Amino acid sequence: MVNFDIARKRMVQEQIVGRGITTPRLLEVFQKVPRHLFVQEAMAVQAYSDGPLPIGEKQTISQPYIVALMTDLLELTGNDHVLEIGTGSGYQTAILASLVRRVWTIERIRPLAMQARKVLDTLHLLNVNIKVGDGTLGWPEEGPFDAILVTAGAPAVPETLAAQLAPGGRLVIPVGDESNQTLLRIRKAADGTLTQETGIGCRFVPLIGQQGWQLNS
């Protein structure tokens, strides 16, 4: 039988710290959040493996290192208001909710949103608002946001999301074609100017929506 506490500690040390991520608060949260609760029960023994896993509905839970890297790139503080596009399993949501004041997260697939809500409630992460809808349009009535994280690959940075960044805000998003993307970090200056930093290559499921890929593309 798998000892999940030991597996989680090994995941943090080997997959996250071992690849150069050393932010103390981040590591503490990854050590606490039970990733195995966010995957299908039959796959729980693989939850801390070094790779993505299917979660149903043709979606995946990202590799632990990628979750850590994208979270680290957001440069979060405890007071941040964060928007997540693509709730998926809810694991990334749980990481964010453990680090910041409040999280708003959008999932287009209702069964995934409902399952994520169930697990988040079990963990008493009550600072999360979930809605089902088109994530590429953001959540303008709750913005602006200090940080926005997109967990699916986009053909370009959605203008709607960039517009919902607060001055000083950070947007992390994979951009490319439907098979391969590059991780980008967008910063918004006080005057509204956007600057872009280019990160590693990555592979995410497509971002579906009005400012993403079309469902039948």
UniProtKB/Swiss-Prot annotation:
It is an enzyme of class 2 (transferase). It catalyses: [protein]-L-isoaspartate + S-adenosyl-L-methionine = [protein]-L-isoaspartate alpha-methyl ester + S-adenosyl-L-homocysteine. It comes from the Bacteria. Gene3D superfamilies: Vaccinia Virus protein VP39. Its main location: cytoplasm. One of its GO terms (molecular function) is protein-L-isoaspartate (D-aspartate) O-methyltransferase activity. Its EC number is 2.1.1.77. InterPro entries: PCMT, SAM-dependent_MTases_sf. The active site is at S62. GO terms for biological process: methylation; protein modification process; protein repair. PROSITE patterns: PCMT (PS01279). HAMAP family: PIMT. Catalyzes the methyl esterification of L-isoaspartyl residues in peptides and proteins that result from spontaneous decomposition of normal L-aspartyl and L-asparaginyl residues. It plays a role in the repair and/or degradation of damaged proteins. Belongs to the methyltransferase superfamily. L-isoaspartyl/D-aspartyl protein methyltransferase family. NCBIfam families: pimt, PRK00312.1. This is Protein-L-isoaspartate O-methyltransferase. It comes from Trichlorobacter lovleyi (strain ATCC BAA-1151 / DSM 17278 / SZ). The gene is pcm.
